[in-house]
Amino acid sequence: MKILYRLKNLKIKRSLRFFYQKLTRGWDDSETWNLEATLARHIVPRLKRFKELNNGYPQELTPEAWNEILDEMIFALEFRARDTEEQWDASTEEHTRVQKGLELFGKYWGHLWW
């Protein structure tokens, strides 16, 4: 019984600490447990909106090619944002596509503005 009480008490303390952290800095330490998924979840909706606004594309690309690249980035980040066992059970083709999307994200990082 004491163990259950301690666990419950620890959970309450942690929740309060995380609440205080969110109030004071806008995020809490739990977001660093799987920073990859946290960042992906943060980026995906913004990247989708960036694509919707369609305010240009890199000089060396066509608008169609740029949209395909953005789609690959979005696919990769959505896949990583899931943070579930299924992402580790995915096929080799999916992992290859995710890797390609992440590489494109890095390559075109400097073009994500308008």
Language-model region placement:
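Long, non-globular targeting/processing and low-complexity regions
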Residues: M1-W114
